[in-house]
C-alpha cells in the first residue's frame, strides 16, 4: 500500500531557486508547500542581495549622471543624497517585489509556511514556527533552496557597529566618509562603485593579483582603470592579519605590515550555504566546508528524493541560473528526468559603475585552447545613441572564429551592458549555422540605438580578416 504524505514535495526557501521549483511543481499538479524562515517571500536575492544593491546602484548612477552631464548641472552645485535616502529607494523596490512574488504563490494555490525547517528522517521535517510551536510535515520529495549568507570568519567581530557584511550594510544608519572593503569579488566591486559614487573614500582590499580574474582581461583592466580614475584605492595581493573595531571606526592590520583605518568595514569575502540548521545528518547528507551540497545533472543530492538548487550548490550562484535550476529540478522530480537543462554559456552581469557583462569564452581561454579567433570592437563613444544620452564610456567586444565566423564570446563594458549582452547571446544560442557574426551585418538595427554596437563591432572584426 503506497505511503500517504502531507505533500508531494516541500520546497525549503522562497528565493529564485525555490520560486522556480515551486511554480514548476504546482504547474504540473503537485501538492506543494514552501517553507520560508522570514516573514516575507523572496529570499536573500530580494531582501539583501540582488534587488537592493541594484536599486542602490541605480540611484547612485543617476546622481553621478546629474553631476557630470552639462545638460543638468553647470558644476556650480552638486546633487548629493544621504545613504539613508538611497536606502529608502531600495526599500520601495523590495516592497514591490515582495508583493508581486507573494501574488505568484497565492494565484497558484501554493502554501507558504513560515519557520525554520530541519529534517527528522528521510520524509519528515520539523518546522520551528515563530510562535515557538513545532509542526511535523511529511513529503515524498524535497527541494532544498535555502540560499547562502555572507561568510563570517571567527576572528572578525561582526557585532561591532562599524563592521558590516553585505547583508547588514543595508542597515547602515550613519553617513560614512571612508569605507574599507575587504574582498574584491563581484559584491566588493559593486559596493566600491556605489560608495565612491556617493563621494565616499574607498579602499578596496583584493586578496588576488587582479580584479575579477574570471573576466576577459580587457574587461577587468577597464574596471581597474575606472576605479583608479574615480579615486578608489585598490590594494592587490593583501590579506588581513587582524581587524579591530574602535570607537570611531575600524583598523585593519594587513599581513604585509600595512595598517588601514576607516569609518567602517564591509567584509565581502565569500559566502556559505544556509544548511547548518537543516539537520542533514538525519538523512545521511553532508556538505562541504562552505555548507554547499553536491548534486547531479538533475539536481539530485546523494539522496535521490532530495534535490538542491541555487546558491546552496555553489557555482554559478546567480539568481537567473537559480530560477532555471529550480524549474529543471521540478521537472525531474515529477517526471523522473528533465528534458530542459541550463544553457552551456550562462551570461554574467556585474553591476559596477559602469556595468560589465559577458557570455562565452574570454580571449585568454581561446588563446590557451589554440582557437584561431578574431576580435570585433565597438566603442560606445562612436555610437549616436551613446552621444545623445552622454554614455560615452564603454565598449562591446565580439570574439569569433576566423574560419567559421562562429561567435565564441561577447564582452561588454559600459552602461546597460547587462541588457546589451542578450542580443549577442540570442545569436550564440542558434543551431545549425545560425550562430554567425555575419548576422549582425546582414540585419537592420533601429537607429540610433545601443544595439547598433553589434553591427559596428561585426564590421570591425570582419574587416580584420584576410
Curated annotation (Swiss-Prot):
FAD binds at residues 36-45. It comes from Escherichia coli O9:H4 (strain HS). Its EC number is 1.6.1.1. Its main location: cytoplasm. InterPro entries: Class-I_Pyr_Nuc-Dis_Oxidored, FAD/NAD-bd_sf, FAD/NAD-binding_dom, FAD/NAD-linked_Rdtase_dimer_sf, Pyr_nuc-diS_OxRdtase, Pyr_nucl-diS_OxRdtase_dimer, STH_gammaproteobact. GO terms for cellular component: cytosol. Belongs to the class-I pyridine nucleotide-disulfide oxidoreductase family. Its cofactor is FAD. One of its GO terms (biological process) is 2-oxoglutarate metabolic process. Keywords: Cytoplasm, FAD, Flavoprotein, NAD, NADP, Oxidoreductase. This is Soluble pyridine nucleotide transhydrogenase. Pfam families: Pyr_redox_2 (PF07992), Pyr_redox_dim (PF02852). It catalyses: NAD(+) + NADPH = NADH + NADP(+). PANTHER family: DISULFIDE OXIDOREDUCTASE, SOLUBLE PYRIDINE NUCLEOTIDE TRANSHYDROGENASE. It comes from the Bacteria. Conversion of NADPH, generated by peripheral catabolic pathways, to NADH, which can enter the respiratory chain for energy generation. It is an enzyme of class 1 (oxidoreductase). Binds 1 FAD per subunit. It is found in: Cytoplasm. One of its GO terms (molecular function) is flavin adenine dinucleotide binding.
